[in-house]
């Protein structure tokens, strides 16, 4: 029941955010068709709770391995799930930025959730596609493996994504358990 409480809280927050953005985009021409992706996480009693909408991602970094915890709500991920294309093809697909879910696009939103065990030393990465679209999981893992402060790791992730042609804005959060 505790798990459900945390997930209910997170999905409720997503629904509230969705309503706010949706109402704003419908009441003010300046914000017409406004929408966003979102990923949120909370840690309680050695469990990581993740809620997300769109293609912003959550990863768990443990023992030099990056583990994606989310699955993009995107057109190309639908093709991957159907077996029409591979994950490698999806990364280069012309429609790779077309998302199938977002906050603020409709009056309701479907939020996906994940619960994953965490342990001391794990690093949780939440990021937009400005980062995950430019760096491979292995490249991010290499940076997170460095024996430097967490804020330095974050700065290097952004620098490297920009160096590789980052054309999108980049938001990220790193949390060490």
Annotate each predicted stretch with a short phrase:
Residues 1-177:
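PP2C/PPM-type serine/threonine phosphatase catalytic domain
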């Amino acid at each position: 029941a505790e798990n459900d409480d945390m997930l209910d809280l997170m999905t409720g927050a997503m629904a509230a955010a969705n309503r706010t953005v949706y109402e704003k985009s419908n009441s003010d021409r300046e914000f017409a068709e406004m929408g966003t992706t979102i990923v949120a996480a909370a840690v309680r009693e050695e469990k990581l709770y993740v809620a997300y909408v769109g293609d912003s991602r959550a990863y768990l970094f443990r023992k030099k391995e990056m583990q994606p915890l989310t699955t993009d709500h995107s057109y190309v991920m639908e093709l991957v799930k159907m077996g029409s294309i591979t994950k490698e093809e999806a990364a280069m697909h012309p429609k790779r930025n077309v998302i199938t879910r977002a906050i603020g696009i409709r009056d309701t939103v479907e939020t996906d959730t994940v619960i994953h065990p965490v342990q001391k030393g794990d690093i949780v990465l939440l990021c937009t596609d400005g980062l995950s679209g430019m760096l491979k999981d292995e490249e991010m893992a290499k940076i997170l493996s460095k024996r430097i402060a967490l804020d330095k790791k974050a700065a290097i992730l952004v620098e490297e994504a920009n160096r590789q042609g980052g054309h999108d804005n980049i938001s990220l959060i790193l949390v060490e358990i």
